[in-house]
Amino acid sequence: TGAFSVHAAKAGAAEVVAVDLAAKVHARARRNYELSGLDPARLETIPADAVKTLDRFADRKRVFDLIVCDPPTFSHGPAGQFQVARDLARLAAGSALVLSPAGFLVFATNSTKVSAAELDRALAEGGAAAGVDLRIVERVGLPQDFPVAPGFPEGNYLKVAIAARVS
């Protein structure tokens, strides 16, 4: 839907790039940009595999001060299947490679199959694979108005780690 892109632009981001395999998502993002009083022509949309796109950015030395990575739990495309539990570290590594020095990576999942500890581990493994030191500076979960019922841990699905690049 482009919600993160809209918020980034509204907060003053000089450049906003949205990567999603589903082309229809980009049409919605441009429409939401327009509805928010933003020029949709200023939103760069890339309908492609995120990991491959991050690799291309790294090859071109393109870097970002802030990366918001909120992958789907599962998706499939021409390059194969993406499974968040299996592929998070790869996504973290690609993100770390294009994160500017002193940049921030917002890494999120709403998968019940990924714990907060597994999210942290993916960030650590991805950072190490990229040769980048990432430090988690904040963790966010569900807000208080989304209580989780006792005995239903699957209800605590949202995990977000905000990491800073320190090397």
Q: Could you describe each region identified by the protein language model?
A:
Residues 3, 25, 53, 75-77, ...:
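Flexible loop/turn segments at secondary-structure boundaries
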Residues 3-14:
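Conserved SAM-binding loop of SAM-dependent methyltransferases across substrates and taxa
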Residues 6, 51, 55, 89-96:
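Amphipathic, non-transmembrane alpha-helical secondary structure
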Residues 15-20:
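Conserved SAM-binding motif I beta-strand of class I
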Residues 22-68:
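S-adenosyl-L-methionine
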Residues 24-25, 47, 64-94:
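Mobile active-site "lid"/loop adjacent to the S-adenosyl-L-methionine
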Residues 90, 104-167:
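C-terminal catalytic and target-recognition region of SAM-dependent MTase-like enzymes
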Residues 99-101:
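Helix-to-beta-strand junctions that scaffold the AdoMet/dcAdoMet cofactor pocket
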